[in-house]
Design a protein with these regions (language model features):
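Transmembrane alpha-helix boundary and packing residues in multipass membrane permease domains
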Residues: 20, 24, 36, 73, ...
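Membrane-helix boundary and inter-helical linker elements of multi-pass secondary transporters
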Residues: 40-43, 77, 156, 185, ...
Length: 442
């Protein structure tokens, strides 16, 4: 009986995690496709323009990722409570807020770009091409931020297949549209940007169609005045405010890591960038299980099922520990060969030997932070998640500035690994208390 229960719980986790992992892997493909297309146009300025423009949108959309996470946690709890009215309101509330933020971005697009180019130094040609790319792609903000709401809502509804279908569709549309505009109409960077824009709206409208077809029964429960009910909106913004500041800390640490590496020279920057690809690859897998944590933790909290909640957390950590060990072994055996696929610059490959062992520690140091983030989002324990991020971020900068004069780039990696580990340690300490309080308050 116990084996059957464990098998059933593992199936629930994998049913959400595997499609989420596939979705995560497709995300960088949009940017990679754009770079590949312009990389054959005959000038490095095109690649630089896509790199700069892509970085701007990555930062902007990363900051507003709370729309997906907050919606996922609250929807999964409503799902566990079988509260169809609140489930319906949460989707419209999230998409509505996303569209409002997108409208603000459209209004402020000129000062945003001006500020960006005061912080980023590029050649005049790259700046001109990046400006073209930005002013086209910014019109995809409503689709992108609206889709964040849908993605979080689908996951909260225990359905990660729809976000996967949407992500795959976006990539196919982007490839076809961008190639057509660039090579048939000779639109160059403008063609790539237009292809990306069309792909974004294709994904958004596909989400609407999936909702209308498979969740049509919920449309009968729409009461517009209840969507902006004061108490519900307060909770919505309270949860998302904490996630926003948590994400801001994440962005600051990530950008500082790149900046600190760049300050130590081109070779160190290149080495750090390559080694971080090992972390990025691992994060795609762990994020899939974090999404499962969001959906299932919220569901069981909504259903007031503390036994199932505890069982899910245990199973998530079994998966996390097992996968971390596998990644550590794989990186130890073939990590350097993987780096060789990313670059043929022998000076960079040789320099990476000095810092490679830091990358080996990443999976074991970081897996618990990913999983607890998912559980905390499902529990809407976002204030505690923010506290853990603040502690970890402060430690990151403290360790770096304390040891950099002695250790150089090793201090940067030491600080990053302590930052990852502390997030997991603090959340582990808070996790049990939070679970009990959340269940008791339901």
């Amino acid at each position: 009986m116990i084996d059957k229960k464990q098998s059933s719980e593992n199936r629930r986790i994998l049913r959400i995690a595997i499609p989420s992992i596939i979705s995560n892997i497709t995300v960088p493909l949009l940017g990679l496709i754009d770079v590949t297309i312009v990389g054959h146009l005959g000038s490095p300025a095109y690649i630089g323009a896509i790199a700069v423009g892509g970085m701007l949108f990555n930062i902007i959309y990363w900051i507003f990722g709370f729309l997906r996470m907050g919606t996922s946690g609250m929807t999964s709890q409503a799902y566990g409570q079988h509260d169809l009215n609140e489930i319906t309101r949460l989707l419209l509330r999230s998409v509505g807020v996303g569209l409002f933020i997108a409208l603000c971005l459209l209004i402020l697009q000129y000062p945003i770009l001006k500020l960006a180019f005061t912080l980023i130094q590029t050649t005049p040609e790259v700046e001109q091409l990046a400006t073209t790319y930005f002013y086209i792609c910014i019109w995809g903000a409503p689709a992108t931020l609206g889709l964040y709401g849908f993605a979080g809502w689908f996951i909260g509804m225990q359905n990660s297949r729809f976000p996967m279908y949407i992500a795959i569709t976006q990539n196919i549309v982007n490839i076809v549209a961008s190639l057509s505009f660039v090579y048939l109409l000779d639109m160059k960077v403008a063609g790539v940007a237009t292809g990306t824009l069309i792909a974004q709206y294709a994904g958004f409208f596909m989400a609407i169609l999936l909702y209308m077809h498979y969740y049509s029964v919920l449309r009968k429960r729409i009461v517009w005045k209840e969507i902006i009910q004061k108490q519900a909106m307060y909770r919505f913004f309270q949860v998302n405010r904490d996630i926003f500041f948590r994400t801001l800390c994440l962005v600051v640490v990530t950008m500082f890591f790149t900046s600190a590496g760049a300050a130590q020279g081109e070779i160190v920057l290149a080495v750090n960038t390559l080694l971080m690809q090992l972390f990025t690859l691992f994060s795609y897998i762990m994020d899939g299980f974090a999404y499962a944590g969001e959906a299932l933790a919220g569901r069981y909290i909504g259903a007031k099922n503390q036994t199932a909640l505890r069982n899910t957390v245990h199973h998530l950590f079994y998966w996390g520990l097992g996968l971390s060990l596998i990644f550590t072994i794989l990186y130890a055996i073939g990590g350097k060969e993987f780096l060789g696929l990313l670059t043929n610059d022998t000076s960079v490959i040789n320099a990476s030997d000095t810092y490679f062992y830091w990358a080996l520690i990443i999976p074991l140091a970081g897996f618990s932070a990913f999983l607890w983030d998912g559980v905390f989002i499902g529990a809407t324990a976002t204030r505690q998640m923010l506290y853990s991020m603040l502690v970890a971020s402060a430690s990151f900068f403290g360790v770096y500035y304390a040891f950099h004069p002695l250790l150089g780039n090793h201090a940067l990696w030491l600080a990053f690994l302590i930052y990852l580990s502390l997030r997991g340690v603090v959340q582990t300490f808070l996790g049990r208390q939070i679970m009990k309080k959340v269940i008791a308050s339901q």
